[in-house]
Swiss-Prot record:
This is Palmitoyltransferase pfa4. The chain crosses the membrane at residues 11-31, 49-69, 130-150, 180-200. The keyword Lipoprotein applies. Its EC number is 2.3.1.225. It is an enzyme of class 2 (transferase). Residues 376-388 have a biased composition (Acidic residues). The lineage of its organism: Eukaryota, Fungi, Dikarya, Ascomycota, Pezizomycotina. The active site is at C121. Keywords: Acyltransferase, Endoplasmic reticulum, Lipoprotein, Membrane, Palmitate, Transferase, Transmembrane, Transmembrane helix. Signal peptide: none annotated. Residues 359-368, 389-405 have a biased composition (Basic and acidic residues). Residues 91-141 form the DHHC domain. HAMAP family: DHHC_PAT_PFA4 (MF_03199). It is a multi-pass membrane protein.
Length: 435
């Protein structure tokens, strides 16, 4: 019986290694004994050189540290930080108890904020980030090139076997060889198809300087714009606030050449982009990124999202009270149902700060607003219903934030609860610099 701590994800790297070895080396054994069309010497060299490149790039994609936010790091742009706080953007990570740089996200698996996090890849058991993306992209490139080359060699043998299908069996390959060829060809073809799609997606991200998480954020922003147009340009936020939604351009698309250069470690040497032993991007980078200047300098990404704005402090929320309505026209009577609803909503708002107040999906809240429910009743849902909260919003491909390895609670419900000690420390540092 497997131990309770065992996870299937631990088998991912061994499975990939077995697949690489199976395609790269058992295929050569097959070619060695396939008398009708043995491999030429130059073909053997090509297969093995490509296999070495795949092994090196995969090893580095698995083992290179995806990076972390330096202890005590603070944003250098104070004006943007103030604007972020005003708009509710999550720049403070409650999990790490530290500021998050632009494009950084808290990975649930790595349990830290990762600079320019793209996604947590289950096949490398590592985050694809500012520091590991070049190795990951090279691995995909050499894997597709190597598998495509092997596909052409296998197809030649498949064609020969098919062309001699009417000859006596003793003149052709054995049943074991045919079975081996069939398994090699099917496995290689399926792997080539899957990795080709992933490589194309990665190249698109590289050319547009957009991570998979940011692609999700762009689609989320477009959804919020459509919702806002239906409701007069604004959307309701927590605590009954109204958030004006305007179109915001993605700031990190700085031109295809500059995008590729930035994604591949900042080097302008094209050959280094393909070199398996190329150095990892400098560890001093990954905290600030060049922008295209289409938006005001104080505006940061991602755009304001009413469902990701922190709940107002307790002293700024509505205090507990009951509704008194005059149903008879002569004397006030207590509406018991409204009283109980307000009481339950107030108790939910007064939970311990470690608990999460989840927001219901937009279509549910919209229906409840139209039915006359109060903001507090319509806003928050049960903790047990987490899979159906607004943090479960999916893009057109059916992906939600947790599919990229992101800690959804930290991204959607993290409060700007910056410790008082840190605020005092920041103030003292500013006073020291001004002297």
């Amino acid at each position: 019986m497997l131990c309770s701590s065992f996870s299937v994800s631990r088998l991912a790297i061994p499975a990939v290694c077995i697949l690489i070895a199976f395609l790269a080396y058992t295929s050569q054994i097959f070619f060695l004994y396939f008398e009708d069309a043995p491999l030429k010497e130059d073909e053997v060299w090509r297969i093995n050189i490509l296999a070495i490149c795949i092994w090196i790039c995969y090893y580095r994609a698995c083992t290179v540290d995806p990076g972390h936010v330096p202890k005590g790091w603070m944003p250098s742009d104070r004006e943007r930080l103030k604007a972020d706080r005003a708009s509710g953007r999550q720049r403070w990570c409650r999990r790490c108890e530290a500021y998050k740089p632009p494009r950084a996200h808290h990975c649930k698996t790595c349990e830290r904020c990762v600079p320019k996090m793209d996604h947590h890849c289950p096949w490398t058991s590592n985050c694809v980030s500012h520091f590991t993306f070049p190795h990951f992209a090279r691995f995909l490139f050499y894997a597709v090139v190597g598998i495509a080359y092997l596909e052409t060699r296998l197809w030649q043998r498949v064609s020969k076997v098919w062309g001699s299908r009417h000859l006596p069996s003793y003149l052709g390959p054995s049943m074991g060889q045919i079975g081996h060829l069939f398994v090699l060809f099917v496995t290689n073809s399926l792997t080539l198809f899957a990795l080709s799609l992933l490589l194309l997606r990665t190249l698109w991200s590289l050319g547009s300087n957009t991570t998979t998480i940011e692609s999700w954020e762009i689609e989320r922003h477009e959804t919020l714009l459509r919702r806002a147009r239906r409701l007069g340009g604004s959307l309701p936020g927590p605590g009954g606030i109204s958030v004006h939604i305007t179109k915001q351009e993605f700031p990190y698309d700085i031109g295809i050449w500059s995008n590729i250069r930035a994604g591949m470690g900042g080097s302008a040497n094209v050959l280094s982009w393909f070199w398996p032993l190329a150095r990892t991007p400098d560890r001093s980078t990954g905290l600030e990124f060049e922008e295209n200047g289409f938006e005001d300098p104080t505006v940061s990404w991602p755009p304001p999202d009413p469902d990701r704005i922190p709940l107002p402090p307790m002293d700024q929320r509505d205090s507990f009270m009951y509704d008194i309505t005059d149903t008879s026209g002569t004397s006030g009577q207590i509406d018991i149902e409204a009283f109980n609803r307000r009481k339950e909503a107030d108790l939910r708002r007064r939970r311990a700060p470690t608990e999460i107040e989840r927001r219901k999906p937009f279509h549910v809240r919209l229906e409840e607003y139209s039915n006359g429910s109060s903001d507090a009743e319509a806003d928050t849902g049960s903790d047990d219903d987490s899979d159906h909260g607004e943090e479960g919003w999916k893009n057109s491909e059916g992906e939600r934030l947790r599919d990229f390895g992101v800690d959804e609670e930290a991204e959607f419900y993290d409060e700007e609860d910056i410790p008082l000690a840190l605020l005092i420390q920041q103030r003292a540092k500013r006073q020291h610099l001004s002297q």
